């Protein structure tokens, strides 16, 4: 029920900004993109801080804020869209996944400084994760490639937010 809460934050005259603390292994793509779109569309100042992990759909959530920070020890996993279980209609499912992946890549590259080429390269890497495709990047790497704005702590994120709220 986070979406109605984000709408309430945006409408509230008492709330001047939003701090998003992320520590997630990922989850539902549709829900994550919906939440990320809400955050990205807010007029109030927003700041995200990745702590521990901002994996999978946590990446769009992290870059949705107007400013993103990552702890030096935090990690982010970038990978293609996945599915477990029985697949009926393989070509159709593949096409559907390709379209979902395009939405994610477009959102991430549109709300960060990482290029589409770099993000796709990280997503399709085959020598990073055992028996899988993708990359795990850590604090400084996420900043160096343009995915996250800055290395930072809770104090850094709050300082940024307070500056924007005044």
Please annotate each region the language model reported.
Residues 1-59, 63-79, 83-166:
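N-terminal organellar transit peptides
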């Amino acid at each position: 029920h986070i979406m109605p809460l984000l709408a309430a934050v945006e409408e509230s005259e008492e709330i001047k900004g939003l701090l998003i603390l992320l520590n997630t292994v990922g989850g539902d793509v549709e829900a994550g993109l919906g939440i990320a779109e809400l955050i990205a569309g807010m007029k109030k100042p927003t700041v995200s801080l990745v702590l521990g992990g901002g994996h999978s759909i946590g990446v769009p959530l992290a870059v949705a804020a107007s400013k993103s920070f990552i702890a030096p020890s935090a990690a982010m996993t970038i990978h293609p869209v996945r599915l477990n279980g029985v697949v009926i209609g393989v070509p159709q499912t593949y096409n559907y996944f390709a379209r979902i992946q395009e939405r994610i890549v477009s959102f991430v590259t549109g709300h960060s400084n990482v290029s589409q080429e770099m993000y796709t390269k990280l997503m399709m890497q085959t020598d990073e994760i055992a028996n899988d495709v993708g990359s795990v990047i850590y604090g400084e790497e996420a900043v160096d490639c343009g995915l996250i704005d800055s290395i930072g702590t809770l104090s850094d994120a709050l300082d940024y937010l307070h500056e924007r709220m005044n």
